[in-house]
Amino acid sequence: MKFKMVHENYNVFDLEKSMAFYEKAFGMKETSRKNADDGSFIIVYMQTPESDFELELTWLRDMDRPYNLGDQEFHLAFVTDDYEASHTLHSEMGCIC
């Protein structure tokens, strides 16, 4: 029996801001979108051209405050062909801790 990871989901408070971050930081593009008929949620799938793995971003209409991530550690890992350029971009974006 074999398994293949196909996506990872993050709930986001600001969908457009989150999408812009992943596009600028990693070159990800929207591949599909699901809008709930009642407007209660939007799910956006994004991926890089180099991979079929998708990032799923979920926006929930009824969430009225930013998510409290607490002490839960999570991460999304990428490989790059240009470490220095990637490090420079991510430093300029303020997303390196």
Where are these regions (language model features)?
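Vicinal oxygen chelate
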Residues: 1-6, 29-78, 87-97
